[in-house]
Amino acid sequence: MGNFFCTENLTERRARFVYEGASLAAVAAEAPIVPAAWDEREEPFRQQFLKVIERQSDNHRSQSPEELHGSWMQAYFAMGWGYGEKYDRAAKVHPDLVPYVQLSQLERDKDAVFVALCEIARQWVY
């Protein structure tokens, strides 16, 4: 096997792992919203996602999908997003910008998968 040189730091590797894993889970679940590829995401999104992964990799990480969803909502509101019935990346509207209890079971499951992927990345991606 040839040499593999990765230019990403640890947080970037973990972020890509979690993001791509969550995207694959969304595809497998036939979710109505499947994220664009990591390299196609706008820089403010990637920067906030890296902060989420940093937080999820330390001792102050969110332990529950509900807690993580609340943090996700705060991050999206800070980036200028708002609630809308139909997802529109250009208009910055998202149907999941609602309290956790109002999410569908599919969206709750996606949040649980995200928490699990963060834990796998924290322990096993180096």
Task: Give the role of each language-model region.
Residues 1-126:
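Alpha-helical propensity feature that highlights long, continuous alpha-helices across diverse contexts
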